[in-house]
Structure formats: C-alpha cells, structure tokens
Amino acid sequence: MSHRIRLFVSAAFLIVVAFISSLAVLATQEAEVPLQLQPPVDEQLLLQLHAKGDQIYACKSESAQFNWTLKAPDAQLFDRKELLFGKHFAGPTWQANDGTRVTGKAAVSIASPDAESIPWLLVKVVSHEGNGMLARATTIQRLNTKGGKAPGSGCDSDHVNQEVRVPYSADYFFYGPK
C-alpha cells in the first residue's frame, strides 16, 4: 500500500472511531437521566444551554437554627457554540438575549451524582414573557451540575443576613410541545 492510501485509511478509521465514541457518549448521557426527571412524552427538546455562574445563599435564623438558604441563581447562559444566549436569575427565571423570559417551579429534585453539587431538577414553566427563543418552553431539566451547594458552615448569629456566592455550572434542557 502506498503511503497516501495508508494515511487515508488511518484517518478514515480514526474518524469512524471518533464518531462511534461520540454516539456512545450521547447514549450514555441520556441513559443516566433518572426516569423522574424525564420530560412528558408529548414534548420535544427545543434548546440546550450551559449555565456558568453562582448560587447565592443568605444566612438565615429560624427557631434558633442558622442555615444557608438559597436566595437566587446568578448565571450566564451559553448555547452549544459557547455564545452568550442570556441569563438565569431569581424566580427561577431564564431570559434570552431576545427578551423572551420563562419562570419555573421545581417539580422534581434528585440528588446529583456528584455529592458536592446541587441537585438535578425537573422544572415546570409557570409563566412566559415574549415571543422569542424560549416562548414554547414548558419543561426544563437541570442536569450535569457542578458545585453550587450551600456552605456547610459559617452561618451563625454573627453572620445573619450575610450572603455568600458559590460557583456552579449546569446544563439546562428546554422542552416544549411536539
């Protein structure tokens, strides 16, 4: 075999292996999503975004107990090309750069496979604003969380109402009617 043919066969083989590996990774990722977090069967995936930012906690006192309580997320949302798509903030609310906004309410929460990370969620959209990219979303999954958990200490009588920001990232999958 000539050098060019060997090079071509080797390159083609590597491309096929990479393609098969990427399919296996995609299948594995879908298989790892717990059944309780699956969207309704009459919905389809509309959009996938990656969030990078902070979970903001406030030190609160209830019945002489001190706990870090989630105040709000504060994150930027990026599309698959890593372009800034919008932001995620209190509500919880997701807002696209086109002005579309959805607010949701957690329906299901499951511990993250990473014990140091915030839970995975299935969120039901409760309100819409605008007619852009998020207008058709009715269900949102929060998966692949990294970080964001409330501190285990530091909330006491000396720190009541103090806020702390904990870095996190997550993938958000937006679903809507087929």
Roles of regions detected by a PLM:
Residues 11-22:
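Bacterial N-terminal signal peptides
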Residues 23-27:
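Sec/Tat signal peptide C-region and signal peptidase I cleavage site
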Residues 29-56, 63-178:
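Primary mode marks residue(s) on the alpha4-beta5-alpha5 output face of response regulator receiver
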